[in-house]
Amino acid sequence: MMHLRLFCILLAAVSGAEGWGYYGCDEELVGPLYARSLGASSYYSLLTAPRFARLHGISGWSPRIGDPNPWLQIDLMKKHRIRAVATQGSFNSWDWVTRYMLLYGDRVDSWTPFYQRGHNSTFFGNVNESAVVRHDLHFHFTARYIRIVPLAWNPRGKIGLRLGLYGCPYKADILYFDGDDAISYRFPRGVSRSLWDVFAFSFKTEEKDGLLLHAEGAQGDYVTLELEGAHLLLHMSLGSSPIQPRPGHTTVSAGGVLNDQHWHYVRVDRFGRDVNFTLDGYVQRFILNGDFERLNLDTEMFIGGLVGAARKNLAYRHNFRGCIENVIFNRVNIADLAVRRHSRITFEGKVAFRCLDPVPHPINFGGPHNFVQVPGFPRRGRLAVSFRFRTWDLTGLLLFSRLGDGLGHVELTLSEGQVNVSIAQSGRKKLQFAAGYRLNDGFWHEVNFVAQENHAVISIDDVEGAEVRVSYPLLIRTGTSYFFGGCPKPASRWDCHSNQTAFHGCMELLKVDGQLVNLTLVEGRRLGFYAEVLFDTCGITDRCSPNMCEHDGRCYQSWDDFICYCELTGYKGETCHTPLYKESCEAYRLSGKTSGNFTIDPDGSGPLKPFVVYCDIRENRAWTVVRHDRLWTTRVTGSSMERPFLGAIQYWNASWEEVSALANASQHCEQWIEFSCYNSRLLNTAGGYPYSFWIGRNEEQHFYWGGSQPGIQRCACGLDRSCVDPALYCNCDADQPQWRTDKGLLTFVDHLPVTQVVIGDTNRSTSEAQFFLRPLRCYGDRNSWNTISFHTGAALRFPPIRANHSLDVSFYFRTSAPSGVFLENMGGPYCQWRRPYVRVELNTSRDVVFAFDVGNGDENLTVHSDDFEFNDDEWHLVRAEINVKQARLRVDHRPWVLRPMPLQTYIWMEYDQPLYVGSAELKRRPFVGCLRAMRLNGVTLNLEGRANASEGTSPNCTGHCAHPRLPCFHGGRCVERYSYYTCDCDLTAFDGPYCNHDIGGFFEPGTWMRYNLQSALRSAAREFSHMLSRPVPGYEPGYIPGYDTPGYVPGYHGPGYRLPDYPRPGRPVPGYRGPVYNVTGEEVSFSFSTSSAPAVLLYVSSFVRDYMAVLIKDDGTLQLRYQLGTSPYVYQLTTRPVTDGQPHSINITRVYRNLFIQVDYFPLTEQKFSLLVDSQLDSPKALYLGRVMETGVIDPEIQRYNTPGFSGCLSGVRFNNVAPLKTHFRTPRPMTAELAEALRVQGELSESNCGAMPRLVSEVPPELDPWYLPPDFPYYHDEGWVAILLGFLVAFLLLGLVGMLVLFYLQNHRYKGSYHTNEPKAAHEYHPGSKPPLPTSGPAQVPTPTAAPNQAPASAPAPAPTPAPAPGPRDQNLPQILEESRSE
């Protein structure tokens, strides 16, 4: 990124060089001109004269009616750089031009057509008389004269034009070379050492070959620009070195038919190895070969040819003949130095400073009925005609002439690239012969034809020995007219009858009967006649440069079109864009193929080529097998970490990028790798960097081996602790003098395929290693299921579409909405008020529309359905394509709707706005529904990765999982598929299509099962310690398993129940890398049925004294026992016996000191542990079912109920994320060593569902529910409006009752309490010696508190409180209010 910024800054700096500064070059050029600088072919009246043809003028230019070739011409008085052109119709009229052609030149008798991108010479004009339409040209040309040729205008009016040109003055320093001269430029410091360079100049010539520029250095650096076959070649090298493996030479070609005597603009920008090569506005970007970044040039640079001793090095190259203008090298104008004869310039020969080549006067034949008729000298006995022509067409009429005295006619035609001569005379056999070969190559060819009595001669290009002479009895009398390029219509009027089509191309130097035709007189209609031609210009251009045919398709062109031949490319279509082969073996399987070799194209229409693979097609999947050159064991010795062995893997018929595209598009890939060693280590080193490793996709190094997982530097034996040395993680790391092997499958898709194997520890005398790699095997297509749902007015934004000349879009949609935009991308304006765009939308429920503007105005294709509507909530496939030849649209299997593109079309697909998926720009016309498998030019958009629920989108298509026909029971996860859904039961204790099949086992007396938790947890921690996306324990508020899954059916808690907001154990926390088990909580659920007691149903032991147990007591009741820390906890689960042989269910969840319990359909109860009880079940060890066979100290209460063991059925057992019965009955045999160690069963254990019935579509009625309790524990479940009304009624009655009680309480207790008054006593009562008064009332007695049910009663009553002191004298006369005691 830093290099890119520097490159842009340097380009901006060097672009300010003299003659190449574009900044501020936007002056209006027509307005300041004098009236004499504006001319025209004719004008309609004085008020429509050319001098009024200025923007925003009071009138405008209009030619006279009947002008066959109208034009408006501007003389800028000196050379200018033109960057934009603008047009306007005539003021206050119906006159405007809708299409026109732009010609430019340095002289009034030599014109060059300006071609837009796509070699289109036609500009869009106006749609009314007032609006100004401006075109910013894709490259800036230089000229003094500008000519506008109207091609179409308003049919309700006539031609009307006001013109504006934008640019700036231009200083031209011209060098003319005649093929024998050249100049050299000596560098200021004798050498040039540069990280960046800019070469820029203009040239014109009529020669096909010539050296334009050359410089070289002593270290092998050089840069050369030359013409070869009228193509411009750039040769560049930044040097080569014997120790560098890659050569530095790079050659790039640009353009075609550059010998057309038109100015061509060349620019080369280099920064390091990054190069931009520009020719006439077309930019090629490439990276130079080699490893160096500086260009080291010695002494001098040569222009136009070589000087002195330098000719010996490039003696086979021709010097340039023509004109070169403004040669710029790193802000130095070498042409200016040459004009000023600077001392650093050396001349070879006589270099002129103006163009001396004769100015050609060609005729451009470009119409369907074009021709030029010139008079001849009649009744001569010798017919002599010569001319020069150039064309791309295979056929065309070159010349037709009627012989005098009715003797017949002479016809020269172009057929299959050669000139055919036909002389027809009455009464004689027609004379026919041909000359030349491949004359339709776009170059000038000269034809000389002479016919006289009894013989005819034709020669092509004056090649000696190439003329064709024919002797035949002929009688020649010249006629009065010669028709070049075609016959006029109607032919009978002109007496020109030919079955050949009109010629399209250029002609010049026409000679009739030895006289050169004055084309100036012909143009002014003072000699002969013409139609649909342009004088003084040749509009030939190379439509195959750049090549519009993709994937190495061959381009063949005509005058106004091109054709692509796609044989042997693996593609088809108008531009070889559509893939011929399917993208995977899975696609061949779905089409009914059987196993065999097939050609696949994983990236579709993308740049990667198709290749051959072997398809192992089976009933349910198709394996794609890609073989390579390392299928046999490779022996390695003598390598070290400093100089390792690099074992590159060359896949058959495919490059690394192509195989990577296959893996990237596959659902699953695997590749077996095996390393055998003898005193050779593999991964373990002291510094951490391995001795050996493998390299995968994108040249990334990977330090894990087969059978292991990414991110951990281990082999397969390091995961299950089965390595030779337990302290190491690979067998080979033991470094023993005997053969060891580490092997296994590599299955992480994003790392495959293996491209190199690096071996680095075989340099000891006894060391040796061998490695072996099996073919890459893949199946599935993960791109086809990349699905998203749009719920509201939402849209996804992606980077703009990057398409050169073609675009194809395909996707599936499903909706019930009547309309919506699937995708839209807008671009910057290609002219003043037009913006390119592409849009695919559901316009109505029966119409899918593909709308676009790629430079030719608004277009759209529509697929209409008469038999059904597209918003039927079913999947429909949409495919839309557009290229320079045509646009087409298809929905499902309906026929393609086609729209041919106009000839000479450029597909303007330069988009600078984000690509909107799900709506139009600014979220207009949003789509509501599902989209999947959206591809643009072979690249699949990651729709799921952009889904955001807060913005109205979600991954997958929620049509099935939101309203499933059958939900996923017991916390199973609903997985959306193409036209169905599946249930993922991996994290449940059940299986079946809907996670509704109970998995249980019948325990005989003495049968027990142990599941080693610590072993399983250690294995899980090892396997997923470096994978963040794998669920690992954590916390989430208010969570019950499965409640976050669409279609979840509650289990024992009842519908809609959620636990309080406590942290839930076992929930994933992003980035958590600790132990897999959370000791602060458990989740236990299971079902059982039995008729015997006592028994231990479930027991969890630990490495300390902590445990958890669910047991059946002697009386048949259920009890839960916990030992957390030092304080035991006992809770009686039921008070009734459960040994009735009926199924019973238990669900226990502990979070810290909060315990939630539910048995059968009893209400959920919540218990809280005392603060004296620990909140952690420390160091869990094993899970026992049926009987406890634990070594060490066991709680005596557990021992009491442990004999003789459980006899009955247990099912659906789940402890956190462990389901031991499911693991035992559903794990394929043989088990892995680790799982076999963790799981142990003693006695007879047979599978049984314990009498459970699978879930049905609706809730099972109580009378049929096997889990239903006896009648003394009724359970009511009301639904519908009756339940709602009943609830409202009950609530109203309860509220009324509560209100009455409140009113009664307030009324009864409003005046409750005692109001005590101490009256004044008699005087004698205060006399000394009198008896003290008795207290009127004693202190209030505090009632003894009642003991709680679980608390022991107090041993003795609390002592009475001390009486309050008697009131003082001052308070004896005050009233005292004593509140009523609580006992009242």
UniProtKB/Swiss-Prot annotation:
The chain crosses the membrane at residues 1284-1304. This is Contactin-associated protein 1. PROSITE patterns: EGF_3, FA58C_1, FA58C_2, FA58C_3, FIBRINOGEN_C_2, LAM_G_DOMAIN. InterPro entries: ConA-like_dom_sf (IPR013320), EGF-like_dom (IPR000742), FA58C (IPR000421), Fibrinogen-like_C (IPR036056), Fibrinogen_a/b/g_C_dom (IPR002181), Galactose-bd-like_sf (IPR008979), Laminin_G (IPR001791), Neurexin-like (IPR003585). Residues 1305-1384 are cytoplasmic. Residues 203-355, 389-538, 813-956, 1088-1250 form the Laminin G-like domain. It is linked to Lethal congenital contracture syndrome 7: A form of lethal congenital contracture syndrome, an autosomal recessive disorder characterized by degeneration of anterior horn neurons, extreme skeletal muscle atrophy and congenital non-progressive joint contractures. The contractures can involve the upper or lower limbs and/or the vertebral column, leading to various degrees of flexion or extension limitations evident at birth. Predominantly expressed in brain. Weak expression detected in ovary, pancreas, colon, lung, heart, intestine and testis. It is found in: Membrane; Cell junction, Paranodal septate junction. The modification Phosphoserine is found at residue 1383. Residues 1319-1384 are annotated as: Disordered. GO terms for biological process: axonogenesis; cell adhesion; central nervous system myelination; cytoskeleton organization; mitochondrion organization; myelination in peripheral nervous system; neuromuscular junction development, skeletal muscle fiber; neuromuscular process controlling balance. GO terms for molecular function: SH3 domain binding; signaling receptor activity. It holds the Pfam family Laminin_G_2. One of its GO terms (cellular component) is paranodal junction. The keyword Disulfide bond applies. Glycans are attached at residues 120, 128, 276, 420, 499, 518, 597, 653, 664, 763, 804, 843, 860, 948, 956, 1078, 1147. Residues 540-577, 957-996 form the EGF-like domain. Keywords: Cell adhesion, Cell junction, Disease variant, Disulfide bond, EGF-like domain, Glycoprotein, Membrane, Neuropathy, Phosphoprotein, Repeat, SH3-binding, Signal, Transmembrane, Transmembrane helix. Residues 1319-1328 have a biased composition (Basic and acidic residues).
